């Protein structure tokens, strides 16, 4: 399907994601990925901050409010907690968490898993898989819309994690 993959390898697509078990026959599956030049423990806090904002195009899905650019002292996410905040509204729920490894949530009928896959040299693959059961005719549009927003989100999380890791690794 057009728009269903960005930044992922075949092995990223073939791996198992927690959201795979949550939608029996998804009409849309989308995989996104980015290589972050920081270890997983530096990426994880930024992934958990999606609870505070979407980190994509804030002028679109956050009504112009900027997603936080500094780490806030948040407790570890738990199943049942809110998944994200957009436009000042709490949206969705966290379905499962494996701290430092994966965060899975649901919003508007879609389920999504953020997976951190550590690589060599203190780098991390930040992977996102989205699944949804929607009308067949809507799936291509959803995949393209998600591609645009998820790409921006992952690139923002990458930039923030790398910047913060660099500042912590080399203090002023």
Predicted regions and their residues:
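Short, hydrophobic/aromatic-rich segments at coil-to-beta transitions
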Residues: 78-80, 96-105
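Hydrophobic/aromatic beta-strand elements that line small-molecule binding cavities or substrate pockets
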Residues: 32-34, 92-94, 111-119
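Intrinsic-disorder/low-complexity, polar/charged segments enriched in Ser/Thr/Lys/Arg/Asp/Glu/Gln
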Residues: 27-35, 102, 111, 123-125
């Amino acid at each position: 399907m057009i728009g269903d993959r960005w930044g992922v390898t075949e092995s990223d697509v073939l791996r198992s994601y927690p959201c795979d078990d949550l939608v029996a026959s998804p009409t849309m599956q989308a995989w996104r990925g980015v290589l972050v030049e920081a270890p997983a423990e530096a990426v994880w806090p930024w992934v958990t901050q999606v609870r505070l904002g979407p980190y994509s195009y804030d002028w679109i899905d956050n009504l112009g409010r900027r997603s936080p650019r500094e780490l806030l002292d948040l407790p570890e996410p738990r199943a049942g907690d809110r998944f994200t905040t957009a436009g000042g509204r709490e949206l969705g729920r966290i379905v499962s968490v494996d701290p430092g490894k994966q965060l899975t949530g649901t919003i508007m009928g879609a389920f999504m898993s953020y997976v951190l896959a550590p690589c060599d040299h203190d780098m991390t693959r930040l992977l996102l898989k989205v699944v949804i059961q929607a009308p067949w005719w809507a799936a291509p549009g959803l995949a393209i819309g998600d591609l645009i927003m998820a790409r921006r989100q992952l690139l923002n999380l990458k930039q923030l994690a790398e910047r913060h890791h660099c500042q912590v690794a080399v203090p002023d």
